[in-house]
Amino acid sequence: MLLKKMKASLAVALVMSMSLLTACGGSAGKKADTTEKSGETQAAKEGNAAEGGTIKLGVLAPLTGTNAEYGKGFQVAMQMAVDKINADGGVKGKKFELSVKDSKGDQKESSDLARQFADDDEIMAILGDFTSGCCMANASIVDEAGIVQLSPTASNPDYAPMSKYCFSIMGLQSAEAPFAAKYLLQKYAGAKNVGVIYINSDWGTSAFSNFEKAAKEIGLNIAASVNYVQDEKDFSSLITKLKSANPDHVIILDQGAVPQIINQIRTSGWDVPLAALGPGTSEQLISQTGKNSEGLLITSPFFFDPENKELTAWKDEFVSKAGFQPTIHPACAYDTVYLIKTAIEAIDGDITREAIRDKLAEVDYTGVTGPIKFTENGDINRQYMICGIENGQYVIKEGFDYSKEN
């Protein structure tokens, strides 16, 4: 019933038809170049590195570690896009080829790999990484080399402005975190005193900072806030601290560690209502938490509407290849490949790194996750809905219209 109620609201954002491969040119500004390129780098950038029969794209993703689910989702979804594009004739007579490397979710590892891609003239653009922290660590590298780094998921608002070569399509924590405070917790859940537990990373601190600012503005009290480092396993002391503050709701700001935190909260005997910002509608979260996640509320800019046949077909193909249900994260990853394709199709002349960057900034495209048009900074604006877990399944609680002011 909820899905039928939201059908109209989702029509724009969940558009996916067999014309997914088409796009129309738009206009978008972009920040000025922030570094001077060396003569050697500039010459390579302006040359045609795609002279052969393939266009190579570098992929950075956490294939191992806490966020491995999302990294594998990247890999599967991007390969799906490449396979379809190549089967349909490629782009300008050339085939796409992916070079996938495991960043492990580690900033130094990601930067080392980004440097390898940047130094390889055959790599025409970089897709990834998953975390904002990794993407931000790579910004100076891609800026110096003059190569696009298009992240499916980086949402720290400080990332894209770091270089004219940095792009992201997830949306921004400067929008999602305030939505979680004002609409999910205060308006929908009726929260007055909340506890916050968040990952101490570039993404996590940005999410918390934006959440905290919004909470102060709307009079939502933060009873206690705690944070932890990447790959933490034992959250018992943090849970004890939150519990002692007696919040009426707890929100978790993270992706990979959310199931562990939920399980440890419930096994401690605490039945506080829970919310999360970050994991999306992850089926692995449900499988790893079982009844512990029943009633969990989450923010999401996207939902797989079972009434959308094309979207369902995409989802089914992903499941057959990945072995798990997709969230918005692999859907965004799929879209990034088509964004590069669309940019290349618009190039009049040699396919170069710089030409890809310039045409990417102008793209106006509708993909799996809905309309995509870059701001001057190289990120996009998204709307958000409230989803929840009922009887072991995700449902829409409130759609995009919920945040519209009367």
Protein language model annotation of sequence segments:
Residues 21-40:
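Bacterial lipoprotein signal-peptidase II cleavage site
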Residues 51, 58-79, 101-108, 130-131, ...:
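Extracytoplasmic "Venus flytrap"
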Residues 59, 117-130, 150-152, 194-198, ...:
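Periplasmic-binding protein-like
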Residues 69-76, 91-159, 169, 228-235, ...:
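Beta-alpha junction/loop-to-helix N-cap segments that form part of ligand/metal-binding clefts
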Residues 142, 208-299:
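Extracellular/periplasmic bilobed ligand-binding domains
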Residues 166-230, 249:
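An alpha-beta-alpha
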Residues 265-334, 388-390, 394-396, 400-405:
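Extracellular/periplasmic periplasmic-binding protein-like sensory domains
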Residues 320-330, 341-394:
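Segments of small-molecule ligand-sensing domains
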